[in-house]
Amino acid sequence: MLSELGFIRTIGEDEDVQVEPETDSEDEEEEGPIVLGRKQKALQKNRSADFNPDFVFTEKEGMYDGSWAMADVLSQLKKKRAATTLDEKIEKVRKKRKTEDKEAKSGKSEKEKEAKEGSEPEEEEDLERKDVEASEDEESETDYSSADENILTKADTLKIKERKKKKKKGQEAGGFFEDASQYDENLSFQDMNLSRPLLKAITAMGFKQPTPIQKACIPVGLLGKDICACAATGTGKTAAFALPVLERLIYKPRQAPVTRVLVLVPTRELGIQVHSVTKQLAQFCSITTCLAVGGLDVKSQEAALRAAPDILIATPGRLIDHLHNCPSFHLSSIEVLILDEADRMLDEYFEEQMKEIIRMCSHHRQTMLFSATMTDEVKDLASVSLKNPVRIFVNSNTDVAPFLRQEFIRIRPNREGDREAIVAALLMRTFTDHVMLFTQTKKQAHRMHILLGLMGLQVGELHGNLSQTQRLEALRRFKDEQIDILVATDVAARGLDIEGVKTVINFTMPNTIKHYVHRVGRTARAGRAGRSVSLVGEEERKMLKEIVKAAKAPVKARILPQDVILKFRDKIEKMEKDVYAVLQLEAEEKEMQKSEAQINTAQRLLEKGKEAPNPEPERSWFQTKEERKKEKIAKALQEFDLALRGKKKRKKFMKEAKKKGEMTAEERSQFEILKAQMFAERLAKRNRRAKRARAMPEEEPVRAPAKKQKQVKKSVFDEELTNTSKKALKQYRAGPSFEERKKLGLPHQRRGGNFKSKSRYKRRK
């Protein structure tokens, strides 16, 4: 009765209710093999269809609800017409391959049926049913059979790499900064004399205690002094320079609409991140910020610069472009100049641009220079741009994060071609999500994206060949867990704070240890645990030894079963045709877009005709084309980069490349290592170069004096004879000591000799 009316009836005392046992899916996934765990995840995704996908939690109160930092910039970017993405091309090729495999299998089954025409009809029906079931299983599951799963579920072996203990010859020379930065360890944000709007923003962002670099920098920055600070990545440098700058702007409001603060950053993504943090810190005050980085719309940036924002965050190239082509924009009113990641900006092609920007800035300014490592170039820049700077050294960037677990996989000699197979095995079997894979070149990153995508993994890529929209979209998808693996070059190795990165894999060892520390610094950030796995060949053993020597925690060597590597190597060889097919689709699409663009321009010219307005003047630059060409040639790594010199060399290189054809796996790996070695060689040459002569010697920071070792006094013949001091004379008269006599084997000499005192004589009586 109650059930008919729609009511829930009560349970009686005598009734037994079946309670389903609770299972923890996460525990099951960890215990079971990872290949099978992938299927369970797919089933769980299908189960989530019971819930309404449109359901959204209510937004947090306040202007900034902790949403993604780059979402605003991504919305501003112009979205091009929907062309097929790389993932769509990969999916198309995968489907084509699957249909071909099915057709081949169905052809085999038909032949078997023809061979067994004389069999009973019941047996035929059973065979048909089995074939249908098998095909359904193949569609739902991955491409692996039960035999493959037995190989794939073999466990890797881990060994602890012990470093060879050697006697220390002496303390190594430290960096340029002395480790004597005085700051109050108990200092809080409330004790820093910051304005209420800033304290409110700090609380809204969830900051509780300042980091060491913030405790050291903010009080000095508020005094208006120049700062030369050295701190590792992920230590809160952005807030360390943003808070004193914002406090200065609030305390001293502007009289005229001018830009007063300039922040220079090396990469676009880091610029967007700094802009986002600054905007959030200034959310409760009327300070305006502007972002001028490459890849974004030039016209909208020019309009924003005409409005004279208080703070400008820019990359060097785009800033110089605006300075030479935007008439109303200048840097003569800059009060504070901030150089973030200065060592990175002077590493490659920014040196001349940095000098040009500093030349155009106001001379009466406060300058803050932040650098992870202090090179000679940074030192030169500091001597030119800073006036009586306060040197702050909190922590060097030569150490990895404390909770990072470092693992290395040895690549045997003549086995360099196994790198792709090993990476694929790691990503398919062990590290399935929240992984960053670093490669040396853009070409290899693109290839790994295609290869892993064809294996059915959710992959994205991030490198310099992509447009700004594609780069930000890849970061957004990785952050939102739409993709599990992000393949990147060193563009993503600096400054980017990507939440939840569990594992970093190095396809090859990077150029220097400094680059290695930056790469593995993407994980184990802010006290979290993380893991790095690096593939090390014979030519990279020297760097491995240095890393093991510097490591505080034990370093482990991971050994993959040979069966697994061979299995994935065979699979990659079979996929080469599919990789080529995806690359062909990309090339065709590029040609189509190019021809469409030419047709559109021709149509526009025909429509406008002679009445067309004069074209816009070309954008000027501080260097001529020849000067830029010379600079590129000087910094080129190898011969094909030197093709910039002329058409003949370029044609010659292209002919040789066509003759060779497609590179093998061994050649690709060697090419990656070669690039890293050439960079390291160039760096070594630069370090050997004679330093610039100066009229006045620079003030070197006073290094901590080395501990004096107790020197054993050695007797010297001439010194004993010529030393006429009171102490030496007394020692000479006393003769050798008891210990010296013992060493020389002399008998113990009684001081008194045979002389008997009166007291002794009296006792005998």
From Swiss-Prot:
Coiled coil: none annotated. CDD domains: DEADc_DDX27, SF2_C_DEAD. It is found in: Nucleus, Nucleolus; Chromosome. Residues 685-694, 744-765 have a biased composition (Basic residues). Residues 426-572 form the Helicase C-terminal domain. A motif (Nuclear localization signal) lies at residues 164-169. Belongs to the DEAD box helicase family. DDX27/DRS1 subfamily. The C-terminal domain regulates nucleolar localization. This is Probable ATP-dependent RNA helicase DDX27. It comes from Bos taurus (Bovine).
